[in-house]
A protein has these predicted regions:
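Catalytic machinery of carbohydrate-active enzymes
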Residues: 1-300
Length: 300
């Protein structure tokens, strides 16, 4: 059966959050599904081992300059989707645009959130209610990223990962300045950790200037010989490294979502993002700023 799932939210975190719902649809119909996602979801880089997903189709929308933007872009997207002859589509949004695109693409069975109800939608509860109402399935919010054992073993060998050490992922990056904890906090944690344990630290961050400053400060500390930076490694190649870690301590960043989905116990340092992004998985353990009872946008 040819099934399309539309998940048009931005970023790795949102892509990870929707994995249990994609899996539920695939299992229901005993068939891998195809997903329509944005390029910045990085789905192609970390879902190539996912047995529930067949084709990853990129939705090219880029601030009105993408090939799928506007009226002409919608026509192009219709042509692109028609080639697959999809029988069903599950649309995880309330957009009339995607509803019409699906109809003009020749898809007979269209399942979608109620139209024009985007405001105040809870990212997880809305998806859970949608799958319950359409497929009568209760979906737990516990994403899982699949990796081949040979990749995990290869990373362990190549990076000299020793089970006698405590291997710790430090997700020091973040998409915004208020999401990033200063380097000194990570250094203080490292000092406390090595007092009692033999530790190795894997530094996960992006390549923008502010993130690189944090990494540089850590690599200039007295703990530099215990650190392995991952910023020059492709995202898909970091996954088996993360899988070999016993614990992750991350800002609210893509790596907190990835590590939790890889089954690593993940402490999430929350600042100004809604708390649900740091506690939706049982593998996530959020820490919020002193004096706060919760966090949301603009907490700091």
């Amino acid at each position: 059966m040819k099934i399309l799932v539309v998940q048009n939210r931005m970023g790795i975190g949102d892509m990870v959050i929707f994995l249990p719902f994609i899996e539920a649809i695939s299992k229901k119909y005993n068939s891998p599904v195809n997903i329509l996602v944005k390029a910045n979801s990085k789905a192609s880089e970390f879902l190539d081992n996912n047995k529930y997903i067949n084709n990853i189709i990129i939705l090219d929308r880029d601030n009105k300059s993408g090939s799928h933007d506007g009226l002409l872009g919608s026509i192009k997207l219709i042509k692109d989707l028609k080639k697959f002859n999809f029988e069903k589509v599950f649309i995880f949004n309330s957009s009339l645009r995607f509803n019409l695109i699906s109809k003009f693409s020749g898809i007979k069975e269209i399942y979608q959130y109620p139209l024009f109800t985007k405001k105040n939608q809870h990212i997880i509860k809305t998806a859970q209610n949608f799958i319950k109402s359409q497929l009568d399935i209760n979906v737990e919010s516990q994403p899982f990223i699949q990796l081949e054992n040979k990749l995990i073993d290869s990373a362990k060998k190549n990076f000299k990962i020793d089970n006698n050490e405590i291997n710790i992922l430090l997700g020091i990056g973040g998409s915004g300045s208020t999401k990033r904890v200063p380097a000194k906090k990570y250094i203080e944690f490292m000092e406390m950790a090595i007092k009692n344990y033999n530790c190795k630290f894997f530094l996960a961050t992006g390549k923008n200037e502010e993130e690189q400053v944090i990494q540089k400060q850590i690599l200039q500390s007295i703990h530099k010989d215990r650190c392995i930076p991952l910023d020059q490694i492709k995202l898909k190649d970091t996954l088996p490294i993360i899988k070999n870690c016993q614990i992750a301590i991350c800002n609210d960043s893509s790596f907190s979502h990835l590590s939790a989905a890889l089954g690593v116990e993940t402490i999430v340092l929350m600042t100004d993002t809604p708390l649900l992004y740091g506690n939706y998985s049982p593998k996530m353990h959020p820490i919020i700023p002193d004096g706060e009872t919760t966090v949301t946008h603009n907490t700091l």
